[in-house]
């Protein structure tokens, strides 16, 4: 059984035992300047409203509805193929410790699967996606490569001990993905929470990466700390990879005894964190 987790920063999950990843991304509107109202007879045209200073992270307005995209691809963040809606077991958004709000209306649109999110409340929203477990057979060479790249040393050693390195592997994968958005107050409404002050919380996914500190305010030059949880408990000795658009190679870090990994952020923009846990089951 292979459990996958992904965490998207700047809005972003993983497949595995292959060269593809699955990620989730909230599509949020950009700030625009409203047109000036028409001039009254004999009067001067009103000055256009000054554009609101855009937040340095994805934001949605409380009460609005927007799209959330799910896709898979071999070259993040370029989409390759949609995730069939019937393969989505759970999809939701949660603010703080509030009740998860389901993402609805899943439909395929070319290489993307689009869902709708209605943003309620204010603060840091965490998007969660869990796919239906999937069984398949992976050729020996591809599976050995996957185990090496994911840092599954114990699984590699056990296959070698059992002389299985040239045998195909029958696997069951469980995939999940997470991403963030800031939910802000509507115009002229009272602000009750600051998304930038929000802290990431575990969603209860089988395997998940939980960001340390405020995930929305990270910048190039910062060091991102993230804790990998397997069934809610810290997982030590696991490899965490970070993919950035345009980067030649993924950054890698190993979780310590507390399940925490530290990754230096070298550039601005989106980032996809990936991790996997491999567990052998008896027939």
Residue locations for each model-derived region?
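Short, ordered, surface-exposed loop/turn motifs in non-cytosolic proteins
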Residues: 84-86, 232-243
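Beta-strand-rich domain onsets/edges
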Residues: 16-47, 52-67, 154-224, 229-236, ...
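Short acidic/polar inter-strand loop motif in beta-rich domains
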Residues: 132-140, 279-283
């Amino acid at each position: 059984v292979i459990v996958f987790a992904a965490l998207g920063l700047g809005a972003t999950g993983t497949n595995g035992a292959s060269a593809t990843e699955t990620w989730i991304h909230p599509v949020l509107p950009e700030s625009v300047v409203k047109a000036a109202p028409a001039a009254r007879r004999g009067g001067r045209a009103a000055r256009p409203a000054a554009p609101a200073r855009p937040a340095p992270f994805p934001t949605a307005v409380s009460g609005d509805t927007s799209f959330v995209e799910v896709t898979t691809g071999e070259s993040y963040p370029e989409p390759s193929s949609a995730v069939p809606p019937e393969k989505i077991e759970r999809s939701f958004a949660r603010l703080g410790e509030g009740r998860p709000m389901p993402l609805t209306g899943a439909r395929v649109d070319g290489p993307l699967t689009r869902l709708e999110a209605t943003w309620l409340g204010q603060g840091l929203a965490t998007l969660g996606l869990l796919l239906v477990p999937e069984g398949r057979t992976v050729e020996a060479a591809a599976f050995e490569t996957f185990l090496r790249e994911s840092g599954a040393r114990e699984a590699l050693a056990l296959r070698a001990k059992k002389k299985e390195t040239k045998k195909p592997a029958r696997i069951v994968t469980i995939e999940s993905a997470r991403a963030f958005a800031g939910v802000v107050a509507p115009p002229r409404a009272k602000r009750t929470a600051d998304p930038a002050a929000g802290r990431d919380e575990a969603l209860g996914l089988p395997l998940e990466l939980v960001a340390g500190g405020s995930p929305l305010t990270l910048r190039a030059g910062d060091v991102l700390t993230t804790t990998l949880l397997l069934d809610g408990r810290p997982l030590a000795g696991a490899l965490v990879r970070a993919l950035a658009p345009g980067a030649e190679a993924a950054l890698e870090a190993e979780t310590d005894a507390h399940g925490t990994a530290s990754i230096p952020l070298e550039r601005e923009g989106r980032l996809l964190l990936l991790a996997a846990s491999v567990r052998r089951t008896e027939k």
